[in-house]
Structure formats: structure tokens, C-alpha cells
Amino acid sequence: MLNYQCLETDSYCGTSHIELDGIHIYIDPGSDDSLKHPEVPEQPDLILLSHSDLAHIGGLVYAYYKYDWKNAYIYATLPTINMGRMTMLDAIKSNYISDMSKADVDAVFDSIIPLRYQQPTLLLGKCSGLTITAYNAGHTLGGTLWSLIKESESVLYAVDWNHSKDKHLNGAALYSNGHILEALNRPNTLITDANNSLVSIPSRKKRDEAFIESVMSSLLKGGTVLLPVDAASRVLELCCILDNHWSASQPPLPFPILFLSPTSTKTIDYAKSMIEWMGDNIVRDFGINENLLEFRNINTITDFSQISHIGPGPKVILATALTLECGFSQRILLDLMSENSNDLILFTQRSRCPQNSLANQFIRYWERASKKKRDIPHPVGLYAEQAVKIKTKEPLEGEELRSYQELEFSKRNKDAEDTALEFRNRTILDEDLSSSSSSEDDDLDLNTEVPHVALGSSAFLMGKSFDLNLRDPAVQALHTKYKMFPYIEKRRRIDEYGEIIKHQDFSMINEPANTLELENDSDDNALSNSNGKRKWSEINDGLQQKKEEEDEDEVPSKIITDEKTIRVSCQVQFIDIEGLHDGRSLKTIIPQVNPRRLVLIHASTEEKEDMKKTCASLSAFTKDVYIPNYGEIINVSIDVNAFSLKLADDLIKNLIWTKVGNCEVSHMLAKVEISKPSEEEDKKEEVEKKDGDKERNEEKKEEKETLPVLNALTLRSDLARAPRAAPLLVGNIRLAYLRKALLDQGISAELKGEGVLLCGGAVAVRKLSGGKISVEGSLSNRFFEIRKLVYDALAVV
């Protein structure tokens, strides 16, 4: 049974709920800037994360604590985990989220299990029998297409993917070199987005040229360029484009590039540490190009006050958030985008901006005002007054501060009590384990007779004495009291690999990464010794300063929201560098994937209807195309009667296997029977019941009761009643490979298009819908020779 339920909102944020044979799978619990997630109908058993932006992970932390998702397995790629952590921390600070802390985010993301690309993972427990595999999506660093396989059901979840290469990413694994990846071809159910199905995007070269042209035009006129960006995903592509252009320009450009985000420095550091996840061009140049991903022309700023040190003049500012309704991008809009008409707000992403957001309103204004004579219209002037909501943070005072302190005091007391109780229970458990192990050793000594020796002699101490076990229980229960301080030495835990250690005891003290270099050369020399190395005291001072900055952020404060009317006077433009497919590629690739069921999500109603209409016009494509509404449950199970059977040993020995691709198949005549345990198995079960685990024995018993056995036919009556079938040809012939085989045999072959291969000028091999192949031609030796080559390319079962 395979059910799908769409829980996404109008802004394309939300969760996909898949129920596969009783396993509840939630994919991409996204949210908007509020970081809230709606209540879900069922508790998840498995959570999968595709990308690291808010639309795919924004609601994870909220739902993890609010709806108690702590028992679910969470899987993602390593870049999605690291960049997703940065995205959440940026959103918390930009939106002044008070009910969510950095510790909450770290606890959730530390519980995520990392996966590598094309690493099949067989799950256990409640998800037993389910295999998940991650494939490159090409949209974000670590972005994922998820393949789910359980018995006869196969699901491909492909949302937000990009088939073309970026500056720092490869294209999606779904479509490479003009072919669909064999492992992702013909799934039972394909869940994908119809985003941009109505749009034809210009070539990447044209878009990059228009992007640089617009940026440089504004800078040369004395304007400032504002690029609203996300915190940790597509911003890396913009950094690559800008840094490459600044590095290649001669003479060097005098315009600074600023990356404004509370997590900008850590985002760049994470990107440098995950080069193996990037595109082939990045991996190829690693170790050769010293400036690879150094972004020497980009200054990271984590505090808005540092902008005052830059000074006036043209500059490029990449600032979070995308919507212009919070974060540094809103503050830049308020402070800088109302004075100079040469200033430019350049949008590069649209699908992540909600319909009612300020960014989306500006993009729609640009579309109405621009002339559509060019592929990429020029910027247009925006002169308007706009009402915006501004959040400010003010420290608590008076009665509010006292109430806050009382609440925090009660929380700390409760946390201390819980910690003490947990420590006490753990200590009791350790003592019980220690006493039980010692009592087992004592029990072994009871049956051994010891010769009479003097009490206290070395012979008595070295031997085994019955008197040693006669201990008073009251005395044994007393604990040792320490007069100086209550230090309790913890038990050393040892497993098969050795002693278990704490990694934090051996961690190195790393020097904090530098952000914007505001000091001049003389200050830098003063901070260095003669060898040019930092002193240990300076590193400690830096760590202490960092700690003080974190403490400043923890000052009790309240959030005040005011509505203010601002004046905007600047240029506006949208250039698509979002890294997503367009309508042409979508309508070309999806028919080649050729799924048995297609579910369209993550797009507007017009885009989904257009994609459905395109699929309906294809004669060889499935007619089972679904567009689910919010909360609607649709059944996308395939019409296959699949059963789990156990093959008898005698049957396996006589099977003849034929290799088909990476698999082997065999034809058999067998009979399904209910297994009856033999006398030896009964005796073995009795021994296991006495010595083994009760739960394990019950599982084995249920498995034997539920799995019938497939036995070979031995009776003549069974053989006479068995159905007879013609030989079955199994496999997939590619006409290009067949053409090569024909040419090797000296037979001319020419591809005529539309799945037709003309052989020897007289025989045509045609691929039909449904995987059928026809060989047409006059009966001759050449016809049978070609047919034999076709048979040889298939497995006869």
C-alpha cells in the first residue's frame, strides 16, 4: 500500500507525507520565515531532507520538539546537515525567534544520520525492508533526489532539481549525457515539481553576462547593488560568479563585495570543507588552484554595525533574507535604497519568495514595467512608498525583567533537578551492574572447597574462601563518604573496540575564523610575533571576546513590531540564477523517466495543469497523473499482487540462472505449501526457548507462520496440472548497442529516428511502447541472422 499526502502551503513550503506499507515517511518539513510547522496527521517513522533552505527544513526544529519527532530516523547528506544548520541559525537571528535557541538547533541536526550519494541504505526497526538512496539533485550543495524501494514498490522523490551544471555543482544525476540514470529509470511512482513549466529560461551564458552587466552598470554609475540571498545554499553560486569576475578584472575593481549574514563566515568555512561534494571542475582544480573557494574578494560580515567601517561609495551587498521582510536585507533596504536612483535591487530567486512578500511584489512590478522584447529585460526604476513591518529588539526593564528572571530561575531549578535525578539513576544503574558482576564471580566460588589456612595469610588471600561471600547486606549497601569533596570516579566503559572516550576531552582549540579585516597593516604587525604567528594569549582573548559577544546576545529582551512606511527609490531587476529546470527541460526529461504513476507538486495551479496537459498528449506516457490538493490522500500503489515466499533448498539447487544487466533471473515450476517443521527443528526450537531470548523466538515463530514455502514439483499429477508458458525474453535493448553489434558482424545499420533501426537495407528493428520490440522484413537468411542478434541481446527465460 502506497499513499501520498501533500501538506505544502501556498508558498510551496511544507511536508510530503508518504505511507508505504505502514511506514510513515515525511520529506522536507519546510516553513517560511516564521519557522512554524503545521500539525501532521501521523507520527513519522522516517524523515528525509532534500535541500538546506527554509522551504525544505524550516519547520524541522519546531516540529521536532512541538510534535515529539524524537523517535524518528532523520537522514540527509552531510552538506545538507551543515548548511541547514547555518540556515536555521540565520533565520532565528534574522527573525528574532525567541522560543528557539542555538542549542535546540544543534540537538536536532546532531541527530541527523548522514548519507553519501548513491549509497543504498537498508533500514531496520519499524522501517524494516525499506531501502533509501540519495542522488545528486544539482540545485544546492548536497541537494538530494530520494529513491525509496520496498519489495515491489519503488518511489522517486525528485523535487527542485537542475539538469545543467553550475559554477560549483554538477547537474542532477537523474539526467546525464542525454540519458536517464538506469537506477532511476521507470519507477513505479515519480513525485516531482512542475515549477517553471510555463517558462523558457535563456541559456546560462546569457544570464551570467546579463548579471555581470547589470551589476557593473550600477556600480560605475555610483550605485549600490543589493542581492537578497538565502543563508547557505544558492548564495555560494553568486559568490563564485562575483569572485571570478573580480579576480579576472584588470585593473582590480575598487568596489567591495559584502556578504551579510549572522552565519556568513561559518557558511564559507563549511563550503571549503566539502569540496568533494561540488562539481567536477572544482574537484579537478583542488590542490592546483591555491585560490579555490577562498573568495578573496568577498568580505563576510556577521554584525550590521561593521558596515559603518566600509565607508560610503558603490558596493555589492549579498544580504539575507530573500523576502526583504527581515534580516540584513531589510535593513539595507531601509538605510540605502531610498537616496540614489542608480542603486539596484537584483533578485536571483523567485520560487522561495511567498506571494505576499515584499520581494515578490517588486518582481511582479518589474515584470509589468519591463519591455518583453529581450530575453532578459533591463532594470526598471522603482519609486514608491511601501508599508513594511519592522522588528526591533529592546532589553527588558522593570516588572518585565523581574518576571523573566523568575521564570528563568524556575526553569534552571527544574533542569538542575532533572539532571540530578538522571545522574542518580545512572549511578544506581552502574552500581547494580558492578554488584551483579561481582556477585556472579562470588557464585562461581561457592562450589570450590578451600583448605584450612590462617585468616589473613597470603595463602588465604590468594585462594578461594567461602567466608568471603558472607557479607552483611546492610554493610554492603553503605556508600563511601568523601570528607574533602564529593568526587565520584565514573566506571570505565569498554566495548569490543576498546575503551569509550569523550571526544571533547581531546578536541583542539581552533583559532576563530576572521571576518571582515578592519585593522590596518600596522595593527596586524603589532598582533604578531617575529615569526608571524599568533600568540596563545591572543587566541584566548579572541575566544573570550567571542564568548562575551554570545553573552551579549543573551541579554533579556523583547521583540517590538512596528509598521512603517518607507520610501524606495532605486532600480529593480530579476535574473534567474536559481538553479532549477525550466519548462522545456521538464517536459523533455520526465517522459524519458517514464514512471508508472506521476504526482505533481510544488508549483502553481497553472503550472501543474500545463504539465498534466503535456503528459496527456504523449501517447506512450502514463495516464495516471495526479495533482493532489492540500491534505488530500491519494493511493498510488501499483496493481501488482506481490507475496513474500521462502524458497525450498531443493528448488534453489535446480534453478538455472540467466544474467540480465546487474541481476539474474530464472524460470521455475513450483508449488506453494505451508511449511511444517521437522522433528529436528522442533527439538532445536525447544532448546532456543530454554536458552534464547523470548522476543527473538516469538519473531522467528511469526516468520515461520507467515511465510509459505515454494517447493519443487515432484509428483506427476502436479507436473501435469502445471501451466506451460512460452519462453520469455527479458531485458532492454538499446538500438545504439544493437547497431554496434550489427556493424561488428558486417551488417550495415542506420538509425532512422523514432526508435527505428534499418539493418542491411531490408530489415527494420522497431522499439514500441510498453517495452516491446518488432523485427520487420522479408523472410531471408539476413532476417533470421538479425533476429538471432536481437535474441542474443536478451535473456531467454
Curated annotation (Swiss-Prot):
It comes from Schizosaccharomyces pombe (strain 972 / ATCC 24843). The lineage of its organism: Eukaryota, Fungi, Dikarya, Ascomycota, Taphrinomycotina. GO terms for molecular function: RNA binding. It is found in: Nucleus. It comes from the Eukaryota. It holds the Pfam family CPSF100_C. This is Cleavage factor two protein 2. Component of the cleavage and polyadenylation factor (CPF) complex, which is composed of cft1, cft2, ysh1, pta1, swd2, pfs2, dis2, yth1, ssu72, and fip1. Its main location: nucleus.
